[in-house]
């Protein structure tokens, strides 16, 4: 019962399935990663995001 909603990378539609029913793409979890103040790699992730 614990299904999570997913968002397709190709078409951007939301689904509960493992494969997008519209385009056949692979959906991913649209939720961001959980925040932790003790994140050892947070500094590098923010630097990569800035470019």
UniProtKB/Swiss-Prot annotation:
Pfam families: Nop10p. GO terms for molecular function: snoRNA binding. Keywords: Ribonucleoprotein, Ribosome biogenesis, rRNA processing. One of its GO terms (cellular component) is ribonucleoprotein complex. InterPro entries: H/ACA_rnp_Nop10, H/ACA_rnp_Nop10_sf, Nop10_arc-typ. GO terms for biological process: pseudouridine synthesis; rRNA processing. Disulfide bonds: none annotated. Involved in ribosome biogenesis; more specifically in 18S rRNA pseudouridylation and in cleavage of pre-rRNA. Belongs to the NOP10 family. This is Ribosome biogenesis protein Nop10. It comes from Methanosarcina barkeri (strain Fusaro / DSM 804). The gene is nop10.
């Amino acid at each position: 019962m614990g299904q999570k909603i997913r968002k397709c990378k190709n078409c951007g539609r939301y689904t509960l399935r493992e494969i997008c029913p519209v385009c056949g793409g692979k959906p991913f979890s649209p939720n961001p990663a959980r925040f932790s103040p003790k994140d050892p790699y947070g500094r590098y992730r923010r630097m990569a995001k800035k470019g």
